[in-house]
Amino acid sequence: MSVQFTSEHVCYVNCNYCNTILVVNVPNNCSYNIVTVRCGHCTMVLSMDLAPFHQARTVQDHQVQNRGFQGNNFGSYDIASRNQRTSTAMYPMPTSQQQVSPIRPPEKRQRVPSAYNRFIKEEIQRIKTSNPEISHREAFSAAAKNWAHLPRLHFGLSVADGGGGGGSN
């Protein structure tokens, strides 16, 4: 076993939002009292107080550092400016005392509907208001046919140009 002294110190931080353990490399010459860490799992920003780290660092300077826990098992990090959203403490943990929490998947984010989906939805509503007796399937089919003729207008081409739509001209 070889002793490695690096210019960084490894700390483990628990994200308060998704309960992911983050591995944070803090430079030994870091003069900030508070740094910001972004969780790579849920993108939550955590403000870290380095005062306990600076006190504990002097005790642990003689221990072996960076024992191979820099992989992706603990999420990722991003040390940014002093932007504070959530406050939490950061304590360096010896590698023999680390605790692995179960990692929950991030919540699904609502995506913005595509132009096609918006067009089809609006077109089905338009077709059904003009003809309430039509089935949803028939309205969808008509809307899809309308979309097939529409793209040449979206690309800045006029009907007179005769280009664009992928139909047989």
From Swiss-Prot:
A zinc finger (C4-type) spans 15-42. Its main location: nucleus. It comes from the Eukaryota. The keyword DNA-binding applies. One of its GO terms (biological process) is abaxial cell fate specification. InterPro entries: HMG_box_dom_sf, YABBY, YABBY_C, YABBY_N. SUPFAM superfamilies: HMG-box. One of its GO terms (cellular component) is nucleus. Gene3D superfamilies: High mobility group box domain (1.10.30.10). It is found in: Nucleus. GO terms for molecular function: DNA binding; zinc ion binding. Preferentially expressed in flowers. Expressed in leaf blades and leaf sheaths. Does not show polar expression pattern. Keywords: Developmental protein, Differentiation, DNA-binding, Flowering, Metal-binding, Nucleus, Zinc, Zinc-finger. Belongs to the YABBY family. May play a role in floral meristem development and maintenance of stamens, rather than in determining polarity in floral organs. YAB1, from cultivar indica Minghui 63, was shown by Dai et al to be involved in regulation of gibberellin (GA) biosynthesis, to bind to the 5'-TCTGTTA-3' GA-responsive element of gibberellin 3-beta-dioxygenase 2 (GA3ox2) promoter and be transiently induced by GA in seedlings. It has to be pointed out that this YAB1 sequence differs from cultivar japonica nipponbare sequence by seven amino acids, of which four are located in the zinc finger domain. PANTHER family: PROTEIN YABBY 1, PROTEIN YABBY 6-RELATED. This is Protein YABBY 1. It comes from Oryza sativa subsp. japonica. The lineage of its organism: Eukaryota, Viridiplantae, Streptophyta, Embryophyta, Tracheophyta. The gene is YAB1.
